C-alpha cells in the first residue's frame, strides 16, 4: 500500500482483519473509504462504491469477492486484491487473477493477530499456498509428538512470534490447551488446529481442519455448539452437522437428525436455533436418518456423514404447497432453482429454508435484473423471502 492508493474497507469492526484496513492507510498516508454494512453486503452497491472512489486496494473474504463477481464486477486493472478469512478456492483465484493487478492469499488466526503468512498468487495450476511467514513470525508443521514432519507429510500448523496473544480471557483451560511452550526457542506456540503440509517445492498448503471447527463464508463455527442446542429440542433424539460445498463457492451447513417420534420441518428447527444463535450458524439443510453412521469404535463417522447424498427436499413438515402460476412466479421459480441448485415445488417456501444465504441473494438480484429488467435490493429478499410474496412485490412495482 502506497500513499497515493485508495483502500476500500469492507470488514466489520468485530472481525480482526479490520485492523489492517483501519491502520495501514494511516501508517502510509493512503486514502480509506469505509463501506457501510448495507454496501459491503450488497454486491451491486459495493461495485458502485469501488467505481465511484476508484479504489485500487481491497481486502475481503472469499464470500465477499464472490459477491462482487456475481454482481457483474469485471475487474479493475490497478486493484491489489487481498483474500483471507478462509481458504482461497482455486476457481476464485482464477477469477480474481483475471480482474486485478495483484492477488494475495492471506492466512492467520485471530489468536496470532490478523495475518501470519501471505503468498502472492501468480498462477492457478495448483491450489493457492499459504506463503511465507510475515516479519517476526515462525511457522512449524509438527506431528502429535511436536516433531517437525518432512515435506509432503501432513501435520498440524503451529505459529510462534510477536503476534501471539496472551490467551483467552477467563478461559484458562482452553489457553493452556492451545498456547504451549515453544520447544524450539523462547516464548510460546499457538496450536492452530489446521492441517497443512509443505510440498516438495517448499509451498505450504492448507488441507483442512483437525477438529470440528469450520469456516462458512468467513465465519468461524464450532459444530459441537450447534449440535448441543439442536439436541435440546424435544423432537430430536440425536444429530450431527457437516459442512458441504454444494458447488464452487456455495458452502452450506447440513444438519443430520434422528427423530424421537414425529419429525418437524426445517423452518421449525431454524426458528428454534435462531433464538439462540446468529444467522450464519443456523443450518440451511435438514436430512433425516434412521441412525447416525458410526466407526468400529462407535464414534460418530463424520467422513461417512459427509459422503451421504443430499435429498432434493430438506423440509419434512406438513406445509401448504402452492405451485407457480403467474408469469412472474414462473420466471422467479426458474431463477431460484438454478441459483439454489435444487428443485422447488412450493413457492411459499422460505428462501433461507431452501438453503439461501447472502451470496446467493446477490446472484438472484443479478439474474432478476438481467432476465426480468427488475432492480431489487438486498433487503427485498429478507422482507419478501418466498417466491409468491416476491412476485407480488415485483408485479405491484
Which role does the model predict for each range below?
Residues 1-151, 156-165, 184-190, 213-214, ...:
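Motif- and composition-driven signal specific to adenylation
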Residues 24-26, 241, 286, 368-369:
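Short hydrophobic alpha-helical segments of the AMP-binding
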Residues 102-105, 120-323, 329, 333, ...:
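AMP-dependent adenylate-forming
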Residues 221-225, 330-337, 349-373, 385, ...:
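Phosphopantetheine-attachment site and its flanking helix in carrier
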Residues 29, 85, 194, 202, ...:
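Conserved G/P- and acidic residue-centered "switch" motifs that form tight phosphate/ATP-binding loops
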Residues 310, 333-344:
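Amphipathic, well-packed alpha-helical segments that form the structural scaffold of globular domains
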Residues 274-281, 340, 383, 397:
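A short N-terminal helical cap/helix-turn-helix that marks the beginning
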